[in-house]
Amino acid sequence: MARYTGPATRVSRRLRVDLVGGDMAFERRPYPPGQAGRNRIKESEYLLQLQEKQKAKYTYGVLERQFRRYYAEANRLPGKTGDNLVVLLESRLDNVIYRAGLANTRRQARQLVSHGHFTVNGKKINVPSFRVTQYDIIDVRERSQKMEWFEEAQDRLVDANVPAWLQVVPDTLRILVHQLPERAQIDVPLQEQLIVELYSK
């Protein structure tokens, strides 16, 4: 299965959630394409569970096989499987770059990571799914700091709304991972228990 690269608004409308953040087109028409919006069709329990899984996959840019691996690992970890799943997804390097304010969207963050603009603990990482851990230090590579995007980022980061589990140093474009997030700190509108119910069948 190839990664979806089409209009994000269309997917947002189908799943009834803004997957991008600040999507004005979605806000104008927050109902599925072709439905003319207003009347919601009664949905089965299975469809609701499936939609929640799709929402998680599209939000974090994860394909089906990879998502199954995330779920399997979440199920092995102590604690609630649903909470574990969301924390694993939130710990992806591309998501951390997005959360820190160095990218406007997760899709853009994925591209920046893939192009090799970041190091983690001094080592170049170009895998968006790389999992960060507590006390990791993420830096923009020295040669990448000369890019216009990153030069302008220093000003943007001063007022960036960064999650409490991260710290950003604007002058050096450094991200410090103080801890892994708890589910309560993750503002993604997911009902992860529906995903657990789907995979438990």
From Swiss-Prot:
InterPro entries xrefs: Ribosomal_uS4, Ribosomal_uS4_bac-type, Ribosomal_uS4_CS, Ribosomal_uS4_N, S4_RNA-bd, S4_RNA-bd_sf
Domain of life: Bacteria
Pfam families given in the database record: Ribosomal_S4 (PF00163), S4 (PF01479)
Subunit structure, interactors included: Part of the 30S ribosomal subunit. Contacts protein S5. The interaction surface between S4 and S5 is involved in control of translational fidelity.
Domain annotation S4 RNA-binding: ranges: 91-154
Protein known as: Small ribosomal subunit protein uS4
GO annotation (BP), single: translation
Species, as recorded: Corynebacterium aurimucosum (strain ATCC 700975 / DSM 44827 / CIP 107346 / CN-1) (Corynebacterium nigricans)
PROSITE patterns hit by this protein: RIBOSOMAL_S4, S4
Alphabetically ordered keywords of this record: Ribonucleoprotein, Ribosomal protein, RNA-binding, rRNA-binding
GO molecular function: rRNA binding; structural constituent of ribosome
GO cellular component term, pick one: small ribosomal subunit
Record family assignment: Belongs to the universal ribosomal protein uS4 family.
Purpose of the protein: One of the primary rRNA binding proteins, it binds directly to 16S rRNA where it nucleates assembly of the body of the 30S subunit. With S5 and S12 plays an important role in translational accuracy.
PANTHER family in the cross-refs: 30S 40S RIBOSOMAL PROTEIN, SMALL RIBOSOMAL SUBUNIT PROTEIN US4M
Coiled-coil stretches: none
Leader peptide range in chain numbering: none
Disulfide bond residue pairs: none
